[in-house]
């Protein structure tokens, strides 16, 4: 079991696109937050033509609220793209699960968007889903 786990690829354990939050750049932030909440993950991917434009995490929203100090309700009518992290840390679907977990630990993140060789968003690796294969 442990030997198999060491050799596992991200694509074997990633969350498929229909199970995590995605919005287009022109959707309102409220819609992005609603989808993030519905997915029960702390991330929403901003996607246009299947290409990842960026991500928004619940932590990004908290930090932005403290930084800007405008009423929370005012954020609801902002566009999602206005709050996006445009160069998110990503991984490839054929990367090893072990290397992805190490990257998540190093960068202190819970979620990694998964791209194919053409840069198309094909999944999301969530830390809990990843580490359960090692315990």
Model-derived segments and spans:
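Tandem CBS (Bateman) regulatory domains
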Residues: 1-19, 53, 57-92, 96-106, ...
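The conserved cystathionine-beta-synthase
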Residues: 22-40, 47, 90-108, 114-117, ...
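Acidic (E/D-rich), amphipathic helical modules within compact regulatory domains
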Residues: 31-67
């Amino acid at each position: 079991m442990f030997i198999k786990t060491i050799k596992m690829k991200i694509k074997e354990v990633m969350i498929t696109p229909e199970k995590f939050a995605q919005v287009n750049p022109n959707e309102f932030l409220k819609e992005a937050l609603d989808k993030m909440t519905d997915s029960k993950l702390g991330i929403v991917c901003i996607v246009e033509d299947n290409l990842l434009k960026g991500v928004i995490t619940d932590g990004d929203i908290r930090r932005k609220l403290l930084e800007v100090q405008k009423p929370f309700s005012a954020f609801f009518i902002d566009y999602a793209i206005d709050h996006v992290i445009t160069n998110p840390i990503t991984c490839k679907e054929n990367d090893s699960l072990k290397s992805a977990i190490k990257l998540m630990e190093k960068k202190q993140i819970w979620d990694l968007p998964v791209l194919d060789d053409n840069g198309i968003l094909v999944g999301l690796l969530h830390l809990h889903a990843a580490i359960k294969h090692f315990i």
